[in-house]
Structures are given as structure tokens and as C-alpha cells.
């Protein structure tokens, strides 16, 4: 049902100023407004908006109350009591769920996955490196074998580094954690 500002104020038992404030807060307008044009509202859309807004306000109040209770109760908990252990378990479950959600949304990945991916890429790089000496020898037949052998030795070193990547990652991860923590 289309209603004007006055009718909407009567529906909610609020003042016209309150309706204007709600409009500034994002209450949906059907049409109108501007100089001399009456603003019209869809009462169903406004009621839906009001209910959602009211629920958000109430949820925020409850969140704050729960947070205050948690902070107060954390300081009151005594290690070894069942309440303390229950609180620790709840916190651990919440942390685990947050980590699972982060993993499901690909915000974090497991170290084993990183090791797998990097090892796979390193293997592909190693196979490309392996073909370089032969390609250079074909492209530049005037090169002496000692030059090609020198190139092979350095490429073998790089291939060995790439092949050992899966063994290096856990150590590098520990080093990273130490430096960033």
C-alpha cells in the first residue's frame, strides 16, 4: 500500500521527524522527494526494512552483552574447574570453526597442499631445465662441449634444488613462523 510520510508516521506511532531520520538511515522510498514532491512509501517494504533494522539493533545489543559477559566471566574462571574447561573447549571449538571457514573460503591453505603444489611446479621447471643444454647445443653447434657441460652442471644444481623443495618447505615454514612471530 502506498502511503505518504504522515500516514507512515501514524502507522508506526512515530513523529514525522522520526520518519525523516529513518529515511536517512536507508528506509526504502517508493518514489517522490525533491522540491515540492511528496515522498511516497510502500508500507510493506518499510515494515520489512523496520523489522530487519530492529533485529540488527537487537542482535548488536545481544552481541555486546554476550561479549561483556564473556570478558567478565573469563576473569572469574579458575583453572581446573569444569566451567574453566568448558570455556576453554568452547573457545577452541570456535577457533577451529573459524579456521575451517577460512579454509573453506580459501583464505588459508594447509601446508601439505602448498608442498604438493610447489613440488609439482618444481618438477615441471626441472623438466624444462633438463632440455636447455640440448636446445643450446642444437641452436649453437659451434659451442664446445666444455661450454655445454658447464651449462649442464649449473642446471643440474638448479634441478636438485627444485627436487628438494618438498623437503625444504617444513624448515622454511618454521623459519617464517619464528621470524614473523
From Swiss-Prot:
To phage lambda DNA packaging protein NU1. It comes from the Bacteria. Encoded by the cryptic lambdoid prophage DLP12. Transmembrane segments: none annotated. It comes from Escherichia coli (strain K12). This is DNA-packaging protein NU1 homolog.
